[in-house]
């Protein structure tokens, strides 16, 4: 399976993987309103052996097959001072 990766130009470290190049119609309108415009980054073959930096390739493939897109949000970092240890 092939995926086409785009980065949001509004939200840093947010990426959209599409099953079909430039087919933004599969992304819900409310998501597009928050993240668009998108800039093309790369196309990638999502083979079972493929390792992605922040996403699980099996999860991405499943989302592409069922929804036509996968949304990769930035990782959240919890600082020690922000944790509730009680």
From Swiss-Prot:
Listed InterPro entries:
YcgL-like_sf, YcgL_dom
Which parts of the sequence belong to the YcgL domain? 1-83
Organism, per UniProt?
Xanthomonas campestris pv. campestris (strain B100)
Q: What is this protein called?
A: YcgL domain-containing protein xcc-b100_4189
Organism ancestry? Bacteria, Pseudomonadati, Pseudomonadota, Gammaproteobacteria, Lysobacterales
Q: Which domain of life is it from?
A: Bacteria
Write out the transmembrane intervals.
Answer: none
